[in-house]
């Protein structure tokens, strides 16, 4: 027999002898007469058969009792004895017809006070299924193990929740909506509307305090995001107005593009058409007709241009005082230090644009609901802008190639070169004599309407059916018309 086996045997015998030495009540007089109504004491051992209060136990007795034998006591009273006996180290529970409930509070009290339950093999716990356990009856040893596992799982869950609460405001661990990830925490649809907020107050119970701020930052219609008929948000920011940012090229409004007199602002006209991507024939519409401004009448051009640029300068999109107060309140809760004047519309636009393109800065907003809603709205706005850009580009190409429509800068008498179809023949390029040049020009018998004087802006004889004419300025007839 090896040394280790001998050591294990000695330890087992020692433990058995200790358990065998757990005392019992004798006929000797009690050492705690003040508690003789429910307890019997001898030295550091006590046996109690009534509740802690009925027995008259005191703190002095509890400070010297290290081994306790309890009879006929329910789980709640056993916990009371354990917590009020500071010196207790071993406990024996005698059922005697009293069933113990499957409550882990008893096991947790034993663990907290470092008390050993000496009769685990003989003790049973009943009515366990009523408390959610899989079996209705379990031995003390099995029940103690299950309670230990449950407590460790609860501790791990509590640590994870605390860690998540700490990490909620960590900007470095937050998913960025600009990368397509979902923002941390709840989504926008999970946020129930609230009537009050520690930052701002609102009138309606069915509207979140950040709704108008989100719509202002996003720059589109409130009907897209739960602001029904609020007069504080203008209708000029509808999705159709936003498309103009993507349909046009070179930054011009749709109805105010530069006149294409053939020179194409430094780009040579090729075969009677504008440069690739310009969206259709230069000149566009039939000869003799009035100039056409795309889908708008001529008088509406200036109005449309003014409305498309009024988001910062004022006009219909000027936000109300109540919305401005909400914006000030939300931005006041951030930790962003920028040299801007919140009352200056230009500075306010810069700040909101800065927040929009650096959305992680909004993580310092004090109200989690406002923060989540702003981040979600920004993500949705970017997706809509990408969709609008693709749709607007397709519509720009289609509208530019449509007959009678202005591909770039309006229809009517374009300057240097008409399209081959309007020259009276087929677009055959340089093959043979230009077809249609020998016939009377249809639609050009008199001074073309909208061109000022006959053939002004044509730039001399056509050279090469579409090569850039030489020498004369272009588009003068258009301007004079």
Swiss-Prot record:
GO terms for cellular component: acrosomal lumen. InterPro entries: Bindin. Residues 406-416 have a biased composition (Gly residues). Its main location: cytoplasm. Residues 1-20 form the signal peptide. Belongs to the bindin family. Residues 154-163, 178-189 have a biased composition (Basic and acidic residues). Residues 21-245 form a propeptide. It comes from Strongylocentrotus purpuratus. This is Bindin. Residues 417-440, 464-481 have a biased composition (Low complexity). Species-specific sea urchin sperm protein required for adhesion of sperm to the egg surface during fertilization. Bindin coats the acrosomal process after it is externalized by the acrosome reaction. It binds to sulfated, fucose-containing polysaccharides on the vitelline layer receptor proteoglycans which cover the egg plasma membrane. Keywords: Cell adhesion, Cleavage on pair of basic residues, Cytoplasmic vesicle, Fertilization, Signal. The keyword Transmembrane does not apply. Residues 379-389 have a biased composition (Acidic residues). Residues 352-360 are annotated as: Fucose-binding domain.
